[in-house]
Amino acid sequence: MNDFELIAKTFMGLESVLAKELTQIGANNVQIGRRMVSFTGDKEMMYRANFQLHTAIRILKPIAKFKAASADDVYEEIKKIDWSQYIEKGKTFSVDSVVYSEEFRNSRFVTYKVKDAIVDQFREKTGTRPNISVSNPDIRLNIHIAETAATLSLDSSGESLHRRGYRQESVEAPLNEVLAAGMILMTGWKGETDFIDPMCGSGTLAIEAALIARNMSPGVFRKEFAFEKWPDFDAELFDTIYNDDSQEREFTHHIYGYDIDMKAVNTARLNVRAAGLSKDITIDCADFKDFTKPAEKSILVVNPPYGERISTPNLLNTYKMIGERLKHAFMGNEAWVLSYRQECFEAIGLKPSIKIPVFNGSLECEFRKYSIFDGTMKEFRQEGGIVKTEDEKRQMAEKHRFKKNREFKKRLDEDAENAEADIRSFKFRSFERRKDNDDRRGSFGGKRFNRDEEKSFGGKRFDRDEEKSFGKRGGKSFGRGRDGEKSFGKGFKGDRKGGRGFNKKGFDDED
């Protein structure tokens, strides 16, 4: 098969993680962009990218690139394409537009021009026109315009790839599956130890951890992909990919999820059971403040409340409790915390060894690693302890460059006018900073003065009061206050379920 260009979309901050995934599944010419990674591959690679990638939101196949200075240019260029190759008689289509341009201030107008060009071509050639379907089209198109550079692509995924298909119910403000998988992959964990999420909510981190530990393809739960409706769909090839579990591996440790809210616990258990992963995951009701040291070496990954979408009383006290529990009950292990407010991180009271900026929806968060050990850092290193792996050092360097050069404080939406306003605001602030420095040097005889620089993460940080305690595989013990211990046994046993006959509910593209 011949190779062609493909584009994998993702969240800002996960580009390098996605690029590594693409390299591992055999993609060629992998290039990192903003919220996307381009690569080349054949039809099999396109199918595998949709089916196997944990951190991709959707996979696009560009079919035309052109310059457009006006809406009429877009119309004429789209009409040049032979649409009978892509849209068969009786099939429906839809168009999604992403526009960053002074010439095209309204992305909907671009959408209409693309639709008009396609419909007019069919009407002129055949006397009939294809129908538009927004909810469930046969062919999905995506047009991306940056100033005058336009790229028209076929969307091979359909609904967002974060919609795995295992989530039956969710709690308030659930963590996006793609972000959860990206967080776990950034830690470097692949199932070598037990995994703990003390504030598990609907169980997303625990389920994504199990998929990564077993190297299971997240697409196994989905009912369909958009490419299955394409005229050139190769059903035999995709069935081969779908049924190939040769890359899956054994997982000899265990995953524990805890939450203080029994409703969240029941929701997480339902989702774990739907994913057929009850053998690997135990979900129980427990409070993080009662967390005792796990019997087995473990990694802890937690997404506490931020105080944004979920109102959390005593937010800073929650983070203070997290720091206290990590310090006294997690010695010899490592913990990773995702948060949004700087003051919440400060309340933890521990020095992070790694800080990685990532976006949770529109919130610019940080994902921090804490290596918990006795004594001083020097003593820890002398005993062979590793604070940062080589991969983590490279990751930090990439993220620092990413943050330094980023033009926007908030995550860009698809509105060109807002994007331009952010750029102008950024340039103005940069100019004002330089002016302030010049004024200070002039006023104080050229002496330099240190300014207190506070890192901003899109606003204040958060915390969720849901979370638990941990125990041993098959029944770890956790202290529940002074009166005794609670035993946490293994959860439900369930068979792994494939996506084809799997009933699921719909979820939003972004949680």
Model segments located where?
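Basic Arg/Gly/Lys-rich low-complexity intrinsically disordered segments
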Residues: M1, K369-D511
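Class I S-adenosyl-L-methionine
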Residues: V98, R123, H144-M186
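Short, charged/polar, Gly/Pro-enriched secondary-structure boundary elements
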Residues: E44-F51, E159-H162, T376-M377
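Conserved S-adenosyl-L-methionine
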Residues: L175-K293, E308, L316
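Non-catalytic nucleic-acid substrate-recognition regions in nucleic-acid-modifying enzymes
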Residues: N2-P137, A397
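Conserved Class I SAM-dependent methyltransferase catalytic core
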Residues: E5, K9, G13, H254, ...
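A short, flexible beta-alpha/helix-coil linker loop
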Residues: Y100-E103, S160, P305-R309
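Short SAM/SAH-binding signature in class I
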Residues: K297-N303
